[in-house]
From Swiss-Prot:
Keyword Transferase appears in the UniProt entry: yes
Protein name as it appears in the record: Anthranilate phosphoribosyltransferase
Homology family: Belongs to the anthranilate phosphoribosyltransferase family.
Cofactor note: Binds 2 magnesium ions per monomer.
Molecular function in Gene Ontology: anthranilate phosphoribosyltransferase activity; magnesium ion binding
Length: 341
C-alpha cells in the first residue's frame, strides 16, 4: 500500500490495475485503518479518474456475494449521495414508480452516510425487510419486479471501510462507486452524482461495465438527482456512444422549484413523503419524482423520449401500480422464502 500512497501524495494517478490491487488491499484484513483513511483522503484530494474508479469497482464486485441467476433486463437507479442537500429519498421513491411501469429494479442502497435518512432507513420504516439473500433477491426481482440490495450485506468486505467513511464524514470515492458496485448483472442504469466533473468518467465506467444504456445526471445546485431548480447536466450512454446533454425541467412542463423546498427529514418524515407521492398526492415531491423516474424510464429504453418517460411515470403513480409495488415488496420481503434458499 505504501507505493500507492506515495503516488497519491505526489499527485499521480493510479492505473486501473494498480487501483484494482489497491482495492483488494483495502478490503483485506492486512491493512491499518489509518492507511485506509489516508488512501481515501489522498485520492479525493487528487481527484478520481475513470480508470481508478473502474479498478476499484472490479475489486468490490469480485468480493461481493455471488448471484447465481442473472435476471434479464434489471436496472438500478441508485445515486451517489454526498450532495449535502438533505432532500427526501428521491431515487428510492422513484424506484417504485419504475417497477410500476414494468421495469425490474435491483435497488442498491445503504443507511444514511452524509444525509439524515438513507434508502435502507426509509425502506425499514415502510416495513420492507432489507435483509434479503441473493436467492431471495432473485425471487423478488422475478415475481415482484423490485428488490432492495443492502450494500453492507452484499459487500461484507466493506465493513471496516464503512466505519471509516462514517468517521471521515466527507464524500469519498466510495460515494461515487456505490451505484457501480451492484452485484446484479444490470442491463441499464440511471445514476445521480454529486460531482459535475465526474459525469463523463462515471459514464465511461458504465460503458466498461457493459451497460446497454445508461444516463448519468448532476442536478441543478449540484444535486445527485435531477432537480426542478434549473438546468441539469446529463451524460447519456446509448449504442456504446456517450453524449452530453442539458435537461431543463421547464421544457417538460414543470415549474422551477428550489432544492430547499424538497428537503426531507428523519425516516418517519421521509416515509410519509414517499407514501404521499405513491398515493398520487400533488406536490413538489411528486414533480421531482416524475422528472427523475421519467429520465430513468428513458435511460432504461422503456420509452423512446423523455416526454414519454414522464407520461409513463405519471401513469405508474396515478394507476396505483407504483404503490402496489411497494405493498408487494413489503409483503414478499417479509415472507419465509425457504423455497429459494
Amino acid at each position: 500500500m505504501n507505493n500507492y500512497l506515495r503516488k497519491l501524495v505526489e499527485g499521480q494517478h493510479l492505473t486501473e490495475e494498480e487501483m484494482y490491487k489497491a482495492g483488494l488491499l483495502l478490503l483485506s484484513e492486512n491493512i491499518l485503518e489509518s492507511e485506509i483513511a489516508a488512501f481515501l483522503v489522498l485520492l479525493k484530494a487528487k481527484g478520481e479518474t475513470a480508470e481508478e474508479i473502474y479498478g476499484l469497482v472490479r475489486a468490490l464486485r469480485e468480493k461481493a456475494l455471488p448471484f447465481s441467476n442473472h435476471i434479464q433486463g434489471a436496472m438500478d437507479n441508485c445515486g451517489t449521495g454526498g450532495d449535502g442537500a438533505q432532500t427526501f429519498n428521491i431515487s428510492t421513491t422513484s424506484a417504485f414508480v419504475l417497477a410500476g411501469a414494468g421495469v425490474k429494479v435491483a435497488k442498491h442502497g445503504n443507511r444514511a452516510v452524509s444525509s439524515k435518512t438513507g434508502s435502507a432507513d426509509l425502506l425499514e420504516e415502510l416495513g420492507v425487510n432489507i435483509s434479503s439473500t441473493p436467492n431471495e433477491i432473485d425471487y423478488l426481482l422475478e415475481h415482484v419486479g423490485i428488490a432492495f440490495l443492502f450494500a453492507p450485506a452484499m459487500h461484507p468486505a466493506l465493513r471496516r471501510i464503512m466505519k471509516i467513511r462514517k468517521e471521515l464524514n466527507v464524500p469519498t470515492i466510495f460515494n461515487l462507486i456505490g451505484p457501480l458496485t451492484n452485484p446484479v448483472n444490470l442491463e441499464t442504469q440511471f445514476v445521480g452524482i454529486y460531482k459535475r466533473d465526474m459525469l463523463l468518467p462515471v459514464a465511461q465506467v458504465l460503458q466498461k461495465l457493459g451497460r446497454k444504456q445508461a444516463l448519468v445526471v448532476n442536478g441543478s445546485g449540484f444535486l445527485d438527482e435531477a432537480s426542478l431548480q434549473g438546468e441539469n447536466q446529463v451524460v447519456l450512454l446509448k449504442d456504446n456512444e456517450i453524449v452530453e446533454m442539458n435537461i431543463d425541467p421547464e421544457n417538460y412542463g414543470f415549474s422551477r422549484v428550489k432544492n430547499e423546498e424538497i428537503r426531507g427529514g428523519n425516516s418517519q418524515e421521509n416515509a410519509k413523503i414517499t407514501v404521499g407521492v405513491l398515493s398520487g398526492e400533488k406536490s413538489v415531491y411528486r414533480d421531482t419524482v416524475l422528472l427523475n423516474a421519467g429520465l430513468a424510464l428513458f435511460a432504461n429504453g422503456k420509452t423512446e423520449t423523455i416526454e414519454e418517460g414522464i407520461k409513463l411515470a405519471t401513469h405508474s403513480i396515478d394507476s396505483g401500480k407504483a404503490l402496489t409495488k411497494l405493498n408487494l415488496l413489503i409483503a414478499a420481503s417479509n415472507e419465509k422464502l425457504e423455497r429459494v434458499n
